[in-house]
């Protein structure tokens, strides 16, 4: 696309419908930078709107998902949504520029009356464009429905942990192992967790669950200690040891504390579940590079065949050799993968059948210079 000079640039009025949390995403920040750059080729007037403050926009523009970028002027209106808004926009900019040149030269009027070189009328071309937009909207809607279904499965999985812990506390109190005050503390904390999950469900109708996370400065050692304490009854009752190797100078990370707790809780709970009585579970954290902290959780359980090591991170995958003995990995590891990826990290497993498994994941280091609590744009080697 030829870059126009400032005087030659035509105006393009766009509306970005997105919440404040959406605007912290790397893809939207890249979109905004592109629209503000010389590479765009148009004189852009970009407006922002938060759907929570102006919910009527969802109905007015018939939006099926947010964030969404809307071309308001020149007509016809066009909507881009999903996680590839910038790529979609770049594909359309040359076409809009060409249309503008044709109309400005007077050829645009003839195009409306005559057939184009390939035999299609202007109206047919416009209809084709509208069909493309509808296909994009349909794809976005399908992705939104899939995201909502994943969130429902995730919440159902997460509800089991606080409910099981509350049930265990009731049993412990009945056996005289804890007093009533301790029971009340446990039940209160678990009810708060369930309430938090309910809030996520209330938001799922208007946004993707990935946008629900609230990254901030977090101390992974403290989060791990909290998880280990919560699972104390499970590992003490079976004589399983938990060893931690966490440096005193481990830097804080940039992460959603509740989501990080989900990941650690799931990985440690799995390690305990697949360990034999008397085994040891190892939890290690290290400052791998200037930008990343690496966490690992290892056990001496049955291990995972190599051909299964990628599949276990997919939705609702259970290992054949453990399905009859345990509840399997279920949805938990797919949830871990999505949470880690939302933070920009990676998750993987190293395992040999009969020799145990070690799960690794990475989290970005907190940058003290970042005062706006926005995610860093990081790359891993």
From Swiss-Prot:
The keyword Transferase applies. Keywords: ATP-binding, Biological rhythms, Kinase, Nucleotide-binding, Phosphoprotein, Transferase, Two-component regulatory system. Pfam families: HATPase_c, HisKA, KaiB. Its EC number is 2.7.13.3. It catalyses: ATP + protein L-histidine = ADP + protein N-phospho-L-histidine. One of its GO terms (biological process) is circadian rhythm. This is Adaptive-response sensory kinase SasA. The gene is sasA.
């Amino acid at each position: 696309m030829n870059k126009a000079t400032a005087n030659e640039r035509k105006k393009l009025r766009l509306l970005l419908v997105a919440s404040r949390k959406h605007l912290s995403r790397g893809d939207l920040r890249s979109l905004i930078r592109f629209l503000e750059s010389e590479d765009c080729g148009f004189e852009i007037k970009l407006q922002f709107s938060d759907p929570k403050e102006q919910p009527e926009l969802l109905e007015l523009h018939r939006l099926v998902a947010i964030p969404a970028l809307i071309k308001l002027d020149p007509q016809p209106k066009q909507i881009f949504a999903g996680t590839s808004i910038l790529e979609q926009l770049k594909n359309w900019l040359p076409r809009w520029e060409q249309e503008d040149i044709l109309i400005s030269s007077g050829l645009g009027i003839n195009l409306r009356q005559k057939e184009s070189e390939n035999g299609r009328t202007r109206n047919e071309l416009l209809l084709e464009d509208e069909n493309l937009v509808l296909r994009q909207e349909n794809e976005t809607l399908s992705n939104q429905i899939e995201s909502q279904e994943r969130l429902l499965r995730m919440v159902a999985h997460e509800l089991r942990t606080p409910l099981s812990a509350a049930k265990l506390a009731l049993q412990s109190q009945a056996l005289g192992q804890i007093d009533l005050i301790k029971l009340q503390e446990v039940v209160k904390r678990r009810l708060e967790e369930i309430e938090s999950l309910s809030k996520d469900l209330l938001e799922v109708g208007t946004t993707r669950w990935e946008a629900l996370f609230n990254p901030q400065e977090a101390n992974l050692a403290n989060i791990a200690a909290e998880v280990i304490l919560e699972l104390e009854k499970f590992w003490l009752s079976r004589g399983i040891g938990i060893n931690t190797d966490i440096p005193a100078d481990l830097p804080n990370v940039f992460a959603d504390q509740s989501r990080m707790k989900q990941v650690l809780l799931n990985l440690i709970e799995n390690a305990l579940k697949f360990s034999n009585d008397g085994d040891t579970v190892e939890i290690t954290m290290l400052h791998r590079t200037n930008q990343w902290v690496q966490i690992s959780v290892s056990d001496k359980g049955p291990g995972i065949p190599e051909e299964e090591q990628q599949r276990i991170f997919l939705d609702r995958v259970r290992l054949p050799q453990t399905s009859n003995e345990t509840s399997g990995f279920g949805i938990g590891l797919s949830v871990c993968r999505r949470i880690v990826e939302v933070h920009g990290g990676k998750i993987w497993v190293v395992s040999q059948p009969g020799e145990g498994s070690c799960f690794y994941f990475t989290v970005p280091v907190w940058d003290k210079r970042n005062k706006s609590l926005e995610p860093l744009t990081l790359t891993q080697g």
